[in-house]
Amino acid sequence: MASMNQPQPYMDVHSHLSSGQTYASHPATAGALTHYQYPQQPPVLQPTSTYGPASSYSQYPYPNSVASSQSVPPPTTSISSQVPAQLLPLPVTNHPVPTHGYGNNSGTPMQGYVYDPTGQMAPPGAKPRVTATLWEDEGSLCYQVEAKGVCVARREDNGMINGTKLLNVAGMTRGRRDGILKSEKVRNVVKIGPMHLKGVWIPFDRALEFANKEKITDLLYPLFVQHISNLLYHPANQNQRNMTVPDSRRLEGPQPVVRTPQAQQPPSLHHHSLQTPVPSHMSQPGGRPSLDRAHTFPTPPASASSLIGITSQNNSYDWNPGMNSSVPNTQPLSIDTSLSNARSMPTTPATTPPGNNLQGMQSYQPQSGYDSKPYYSAAPSTHPQYAPQQPLPQQSMAQYGHSMPTSSYRDMAPPSSQRGSVTEIESDVKTERYGQGTVAKTEPEQEQEYAQPDSGYNTGRGSYYTTNPSVGGLAHDHSQLTPDMTGSPQQNGSGRMTPRTSNTAPQWAPGYTTPPRPAAASSLYNIVSDTRGTSGANGSTSDNYSVASNSGYSTGMNGSMGSNKRMRDDDDDRIVPPDSRGEFDTKRRKTLTETPVGGPVGGVPLGLQPMKAGGSLISARR
């Protein structure tokens, strides 16, 4: 290569260097490689030619350049037809190749192009790129043309042009620019609004004069075209802001206007039509419609990626049935999020029908990993949607220290120590106190009818309220009592009075210390019987339990709770050895015969009167 370049004149070597620089970014060009691949060939450019053709080939990296490089004799025709297109510094449509300086220095750039001072004709190779936006503050449509990275706007109503941005395209200094604009007689200063609309607006004619004076009219094409609205087309080339042009303006196609310059300049525009789609003009139509489709195409929700396990699939829109099998493996998801995701998915063929999706969701509830925990087996009544949809089997409920109520009232297995210590002595008290005939027959049906609907909730109450002070206190106070003292086969350890040995009424108190309250009635014994009594000293609080119509129960209940002194005596007498069982029974029976000093008019049936909770707080308080 050195031997080939040695005997050649300086200009020829220089042309080789310039072509080597420009063709570095176009490896597909064959015109520049002919020197090095075929040494016997003559040089591409004659020594007498200027630098323009060498730089003009860099603009058109297509097979045409090979043909023109072989036809060496008429280089001047290529100069006249192609150099002016290359000399126009259009940063958007041309490759960033630093070859313009050579063409400008040669003195030949303006030979084939007649400068249009009116701005109506398109420069060679320039495509009309105009966008429009609605200037809401002024209530006018603005046409925008970008040149050298500056957006110059023109108003539709009065044709005024932003002179500040116009002179910025010319590269004028700030002081000179402001001085020129201040001397304008007709001007409109805009200080509030978008950045490209701020500045000093001058009339159309003055703006055209400034553009011609600064030689930037061709750069600003088609800003000065009279009917610029005809150049508006679908905003595929707009990447700065959303278009607000009416649909009628968007549909006005550019075909008749854009193709007229191509008929005038067929050689140069032919190359430009091949070259300009590469840098930026065609990249914008490719990107813009994809954004529009992204807004409308059914996309899975954000949390559906973790819900479904999309990573194992080829396409995120392929909702195959295998996704349902992966749903139960995602641990932290709850049922609500999955159902809301199913609702957010559009009902198009790209998604699974809701029936199949919900069947996959049902696998949460019967899982042993959830149902074996007390937190998920039964929920409070305020959240019924989380409760299990099938009643849990009795075997699984034995873990919580509660036995599920069955049809027979006597076969409940002994519960755990804590709950057993709360409830064992109650059955003995009730069986001996209310052993008179008809009470034992009618009372279980009442309790079953009242307490059975709550069994789904009461089973889980122990897990929510295990830290209840009343239950804990009673469990420790009376844990020393044995079944021998109470004589009860089922319940142990507490002297609190409950309805009989049936298992439905004791479901109230171990964890659910606030049963439904009937209407209030005043009672002297509210201090003892009400768990929510605010003061233990005065009996002015209302008895929320004693409003039923059976006086037989109320006398027994209230009489047994006669006074605080009576309660202290009972507690002292409870801790007795097993051999004094007879004396203890006679004391407990004696309370039945004592007439209370003014009990309520009507008592509550035993199934509705949770006296166990009342005794729990008092004995725990002492």
Swiss-Prot record:
Keywords: Conidiation, DNA-binding, Nucleus, Sporulation, Transcription, Transcription regulation. SMART domains: KilA-N. One of its GO terms (molecular function) is sequence-specific DNA binding. The lineage of its organism: Eukaryota, Fungi, Dikarya, Ascomycota, Pezizomycotina. It comes from Emericella nidulans (strain FGSC A4 / ATCC 38163 / CBS 112.46 / NRRL 194 / M139) (Aspergillus nidulans). This is Cell pattern formation-associated protein stuA. It comes from the Eukaryota. Residues 163-184 bind DNA. Residues 274-283, 302-345, 355-370, 404-421, 455-470, 480-506, 549-563 have a biased composition (Polar residues). PANTHER family: PROTEIN SOK2-RELATED. GO terms for cellular component: nucleus. Belongs to the EFG1/PHD1/stuA family. Residues 566-586 have a biased composition (Basic and acidic residues). It is found in: Nucleus. Residues 129-235 form the HTH APSES-type domain. Residues 1-24, 62-81, 239-517, 549-622 are annotated as: Disordered. Pfam families: KilA-N. The gene is stuA. Its main location: nucleus. Residues 384-395 have a biased composition (Low complexity). InterPro entries: EFG1/Phd1/StuA, HTH_APSES_sf, KilA/APSES_HTH, Tscrpt_reg_HTH_APSES-type. One of its GO terms (biological process) is regulation of transcription by RNA polymerase II.
